[in-house]
Amino acid sequence: AKEAGATHAINASEVDPVSALRDLTGGGATDVFEAVGSEKALGQAYSATCKGGRTITVGLPSPGSELRIPALSLVAEERQLLGSYMGSCIPKRDIPRFLELSREGHLQIDVLNSRFITLDQVNEGFDALAQGEVARQIIKFDI
């Protein structure tokens, strides 16, 4: 995360991420993004959001996943829970901007890629993705 520009990183296997984020921010973050796609991670993200804050999920949960949150907190604490499919990207608008940010050194794209694979490795690539061994892979085409 720090390689990609994060100022802080919390290892959820070492500490309670909700408590750590609430301590770090003095009561919760204004915007919390969940990118894993698990209801546990989304619940933690919501719990780490401050009053008046937004929890944004870009992670794709498995079918049948359900989220339980204190419903009153949405209204009484004026929180927002937002879903964003594929980052709500508009490719024609956003990809040129992402490339510009990358060229300027403001967006570290390389750290988001776990590995390069060839087209004949695509099935192994999907298996590795399903097993959680990689986050992103780029297919290299020999043309």
Could you tell me what each predicted segment is?
Residues 1-44:
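Adenosine-nucleotide cofactor-binding segment
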Residues 10, 30-35, 58-60, 84-87, ...:
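Glycine- and other small-residue-rich loops at beta-strand/loop junctions that grip anionic moieties
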Residues 15, 43-47, 92-143:
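C-terminal hydrophobic helical "lid"/dimerization subdomain
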Residues 15, 61-62:
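Flexible glycine-rich beta->alpha loop in the catalytic core of nucleotide-sugar glycosyltransferases
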Residues 26, 37, 50, 130, ...:
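Short conserved AdoMet
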Residues 39-51, 57:
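Rossmann-fold NAD(P) dinucleotide-binding segment
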